A protein has these predicted regions:
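Bacterial/eukaryotic Sec-type N-terminal signal peptides
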Residues: 1-2, 630
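N-terminal regions that are enriched for targeting/export leaders
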Residues: 3-5, 36, 40-42
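Acidic/proline-rich low-complexity IDRs
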Residues: 4, 114, 122, 608-610
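Carbohydrate-binding surfaces of carbohydrate-active enzymes
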Residues: 12-17, 22, 28-33, 46-49, ...
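Surface-exposed aromatic
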Residues: 60
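Catalytic and substrate-binding clefts that recognize carbohydrates or anionic sugar/phosphate headgroups
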Residues: 100-156
Length: 631
């Protein structure tokens, strides 16, 4: 049985966590106490332990590490958790060393497979010695055997206050991923066999689409749902980064107790997918691995990133944080802090560096208090819902590689959804993503679409391709009276035809509640204005809370310019906010480095709530200054 999420420290407090990289030792109890005390004194709410071999930082004098999963290692986990409990910090653990899951505890028959046979992919940078195969993420039995092998060593760390077990992003060899039992399952589902068509499964768009759909559906059940079940059996929560897998990301994120996004390798608008999944599934927390690689990746030989290594500026960090808050994040996990004794020199190879020697150490208490305050507010009530926008899963699965000019480190395929964002015309409607599995749960009520506890005024689709199962649900919802915006007529993806597809399209074309534009319906946007800033809204007890990010947050992408947050004057954004049938004219004024929290009541009152923290003005470099002048 799943533990009560209300007992999770990250639920009880909105203070940010940090990833805690255990790299070089020695790993001594007094140093564990030293770092946890420092975190507690600087506004952190917990840690997430992660173990890596720091190949980027050779230290011949470093003592041997405790044996992976050995008695000493397990005892250190137990001590860390007990002391974290004692001082009121949360303590989570990555279920493995490195990512994705794998290592010496993976049986040969449980190792990852491809369309061509055994996968050559191996873990790089694992804490342990010995074989490092990647786990077969398409086999529930393989995942359970892997977890069973690790569970005894993790048991001392899982005692006491409930912890989360963390699954990092799925950086798999996803272009060829397979499992032997899928040959027959694929034929049963699609009516033909893939043997002899392997090259077509990689190159023919519609066959490749069906291959990816098969892999994604299998991974949803065999990995994400199974992982959550394993966590619950161990008395833990599942905190999961589902991105990097060809699944329906909404379903994959919704399988976790705490869906987790990341930025900045994924742009801030990407976080709306995890936040939408949480809203649809009734999850309270949306966490983010935050600030990673903010100016680039030093480990990839990026000279520009190396120039700013360990020189991170609080104003830039706050601008990125505000961008994430405006897309639904309400729990931060700093990336990250290396294990260090007093005066230690261990460091991770990408930003940011958290610790007493951080460039921004003096700002941490105030900045973390700001994150705690805003995240706490963004947990009140429930996410505001107005417009459900169909996530273009089919469009992205049919495409292949990310164009070179759009590629960021680690980005490979369009189905990763890194660049997907709701259409601009939907911005004022506070759009939430939706996909086929959640359409199946939906019902029509007085023209609205109701999914669980979420009620939308309309369903919006603007896709080139739509699976027959999804179109069937859209037609059903239309018959139930749901307002539907069908911007263009979709086409059926895949190799097989469906005799009912044309009929569903015809029924939609004839339905009076199906239109080609939002303007055809009397659905009021939440916010209107010449320039709507990035925002997120939550509703409860007759009021609306809106976090409105500084408009500069809309420009945050990888990599940020050094000092990109520089702002010398206020930005005025007059908007009209319509809530409860009442419109409010609000003159938003964003002072430099500040965002706004707005409370709107149904009786027409709009109040700006004070967010105290203002970071020191950044010092830009010449490139930033010149680009801002051109802008």
């Amino acid at each position: 049985m799943a533990p009560d999420l209300k007992q999770y420290p990250a639920y009880q407090s909105s203070r940010p966590y940090t990833r805690w990289w255990w790299l070089h030792g020695p790993f001594r109890q007094q140093d564990i106490v030293y770092q946890l005390d420092w975190l507690n004194a600087n506004g952190f709410g917990g840690v997430e332990l992660a173990w890596l071999d720091p190949t980027w930082q050779t230290r011949p004098d470093a003592p041997p590490r405790p044996e992976w999963l050995g008695e000493e290692w397990s005892a250190l986990l137990g001590f860390t958790k007990r002391y974290a409990d004692e001082i009121g910090l949360g303590c989570d653990f990555t279920l493995g060393s490195c990512w994705p899951f794998g290592g010496s505890r993976v049986r040969p028959e449980d190792a990852a497979q491809t369309l061509d046979g055994a996968s050559p992919q191996r873990l790089y940078g694992s804490w342990e010695s010995g074989p490092r195969p990647v786990l077969n993420h398409l086999s529930a039995d393989a995942l359970r055997r892997y977890a069973d092998a690790l569970a005894p060593a993790f048991a001392p760390g899982l005692a006491g206050t409930p912890s989360a077990l963390f699954c990092d992003s799925g950086e798999l060899d996803a272009g060829r991923l397979w499992s032997p039992e899928l040959w027959d399952a694929f034929e049963a589902r699609y009516g033909y066999r893939l043997e002899g068509r392997i090259e077509l499964a990689r190159t023919q768009p519609h066959m490749r689409y069906e291959y990816r759909r098969m892999v994604g559906a299998t991974m949803q059940q065999a990995f994400f749902e199974t992982f959550a079940d394993i966590c619950h059996q161990l008395g833990a929560f599942a905190r999961v980064q589902a991105h990097g897998t060809p699944t329906d990301l909404l379903s994959a994120y919704a399988s976790a107790d705490v869906p987790e996004t990341e930025s900045l390798l994924f742009p801030p608008p990407f976080s709306r997918i995890a936040a939408s999944a949480a809203a649809l599934a009734g999850k309270d927390l949306v966490s983010a691995e935050a600030f990673s690689c903010i100016y680039g990746i030093v480990g990839l030989g990026d000279l520009r990133a190396a120039r700013y290594w360990r020189r991170e500026q609080p104003a830039d960090l706050k601008l990125l944080a505000d961008a994430l808050l405006a897309h639904g994040v309400n729990q931060f996990v700093w990336h990250g802090m290396p294990f260090n004794p007093p005066g230690g020199k261990n460091e991770f190879y990408t930003s940011v560096h958290v610790g007493p020697d951080a460039a921004f150490a003096s700002e941490l208490p105030a900045f973390n208090e700001y994150l705690e305050t805003v995240c706490g507010m963004m947990r009140r009530g429930r996410p505001y819902a107005n417009l459900a926008v169909y996530l273009p899963n089919e469009d992205m699965l049919l495409r292949d590689r990310v164009p070179d000019d759009q590629r960021t480190p680690g980005a490979m395929f369009e189905w990763e959804m890194r660049q997907v964002a709701p259409p601009p015309e939907t911005a004022g409607y506070h759009p939430l993503w939706i996909s086929e599995p959640f359409l199946r749960e939906g019902i029509g009520v007085d023209g609205d679409l109701v999914v669980g506890n979420v009620r939308f005024s309309a369903l919006y689709l603007n896709v080139e391709w739509l699976a027959s199962g999804a179109l069937e649900q859209v037609a059903r919802l239309a018959a139930e009276g749901v307002r539907i915006v069908l911007v263009r007529e979709p086409k059926l993806p895949g190799m097989r035809r469906n005799a009912q597809y044309a009929g569903w399209l015809a029924a939609l074309a004839a339905a009076p509640n199906v239109r080609a534009s939002l303007a055809a319906f009397d659905v009021q946007p939440l916010m209107q204005g010449a320039s709507v800033p990035p925002y997120w809204a939550r509703e409860g007890q007759g009021e609306l809370l809106l976090f409105l990010a500084n408009p500069l947050a809309a420009q945050v992408r990888y990599p940020m310019l050094y000092g990109q947050s520089l702002s010398e004057s206020a930005i005025d954004c007059p908007v009209t906010i319509t809530y409860g049938g009442v419109s409010h004219e609000v003159a938003l004024r964003f002072e430099p480095y500040r965002s706004i929290m707005l409370r709107v009541t149904r009786d027409g009152q709009a109040t700006v709530l004070d967010l105290d923290y203002v970071p020191p003005p950044p010092v830009p470099d010449e490139q930033t200054s010149s680009e801002q002048k051109r802008g």
